[in-house]
Amino acid sequence: MIDKSAFVHPTAIVEEGASIGANAHIGPFCIVGPHVGIGEGTVLKSHVVVNGHTKIGRDNEIYQFASIGEVNQDLKYAGEPTRVEIGDRNRIRESVTIHRGTVQGGGLTKVGSDNLLMINAHIAHDCTVGNRCILANNATLAGHVSVDDFAIIGGMTAVHQFCIIGAHVMVGGCSGVAQDVPPYVIAQGNHATPFGVNIEGLKRRGFSREAITAIRNAYKLIYRSGKTLDEVKPEIAELAETYPEVKAFTDFFSRSTRGLIR
């Protein structure tokens, strides 16, 4: 169904069964598949292809030649009706690709809200991207990667399958991430290694001086104490009792499967 207030350019193809919300804009030469939902106020500039079982929220801006919901590149994929879900107010720039999930990975590729996906960024099958993240030009997420809120991934950076990028992380450009990056950390290189805490980013987001100090102390326990991760976990958990921001580390440890960058 196409809402009466939506605009669909005469050269665009919106297949029967698609849902186009109020005040949405489907620009020239766009293709919208039959199982696609486009939310209120979302704009497809031109030459955008959205197919598969894909739901896109409201007030997104999607630029030319982006491809969303296409068949993934997992050789095990056999045509199952797996999905893509995208939240609200995202800016998805030229030639971004976001692939549908796989049955083996839960069947869903999910992008939250208020993200900036720059030119040529790639989000593979079964990835989860949180809110207010930035993927710079040519950043590439392999399958099953998780990117937590406020993370920034630099241009030309590749993230290995099943890795987790923690909240408020900043990964420098041209990096290769092969293990999990704990929250608040700056990482750079191939293979990516830690370079301290993202202090400037935390200041901009309103973290108190005391909270930043506690986060730095947790970082030092992980990377500079000479102890194993299992040895420092109780100390970090104790620190989190006073500073809730530190709890992001303990939650992260419970999710990590690939080990931490070193």
Swiss-Prot record:
<dbReference type="InterPro" id="IPR018357">
    <property type="entry name" value="Hexapep_transf_CS"/>
</dbReference>
<dbReference type="GO" id="GO:0009245">
    <property type="term" value="P:lipid A biosynthetic process"/>
</dbReference>
<comment type="function">
    <text>Involved in the biosynthesis of lipid A, a phosphorylated glycolipid that anchors the lipopolysaccharide to the outer membrane of the cell.</text>
</comment>
<comment type="subunit">
    <text>Homotrimer.</text>
</comment>
<dbReference type="InterPro" id="IPR029098">
    <property type="entry name" value="Acetyltransf_C"/>
</dbReference>
<keyword id="KW-0441">Lipid A biosynthesis</keyword>
<dbReference type="InterPro" id="IPR010137">
    <property type="entry name" value="Lipid_A_LpxA"/>
</dbReference>
<dbReference type="Pfam" id="PF13720">
    <property type="entry name" value="Acetyltransf_11"/>
</dbReference>
<keyword id="KW-0012">Acyltransferase</keyword>
<protein>
    <recommendedName>
        <fullName>Acyl-[acyl-carrier-protein]--UDP-N-acetylglucosamine O-acyltransferase</fullName>
        <ecNumber>2.3.1.129</ecNumber>
    </recommendedName>
</protein>
<keyword id="KW-0444">Lipid biosynthesis</keyword>
<dbReference type="InterPro" id="IPR001451">
    <property type="entry name" value="Hexapep"/>
</dbReference>
<keyword id="KW-0808">Transferase</keyword>
<dbReference type="GO" id="GO:0016020">
    <property type="term" value="C:membrane"/>
</dbReference>
<comment type="similarity">
    <text>Belongs to the transferase hexapeptide repeat family. LpxA subfamily.</text>
</comment>
<keyword id="KW-0443">Lipid metabolism</keyword>
<dbReference type="InterPro" id="IPR011004">
    <property type="entry name" value="Trimer_LpxA-like_sf"/>
</dbReference>
<dbReference type="Pfam" id="PF00132">
    <property type="entry name" value="Hexapep"/>
</dbReference>
<dbReference type="GO" id="GO:0005737">
    <property type="term" value="C:cytoplasm"/>
</dbReference>
<keyword id="KW-0677">Repeat</keyword>
<dbReference type="InterPro" id="IPR037157">
    <property type="entry name" value="Acetyltransf_C_sf"/>
</dbReference>
<keyword id="KW-0963">Cytoplasm</keyword>
<comment type="pathway">
    <text>Glycolipid biosynthesis; lipid IV(A) biosynthesis; lipid IV(A) from (3R)-3-hydroxytetradecanoyl-[acyl-carrier-protein] and UDP-N-acetyl-alpha-D-glucosamine: step 1/6.</text>
</comment>
<dbReference type="GO" id="GO:0008780">
    <property type="term" value="F:acyl-[acyl-carrier-protein]-UDP-N-acetylglucosamine O-acyltransferase activity"/>
</dbReference>
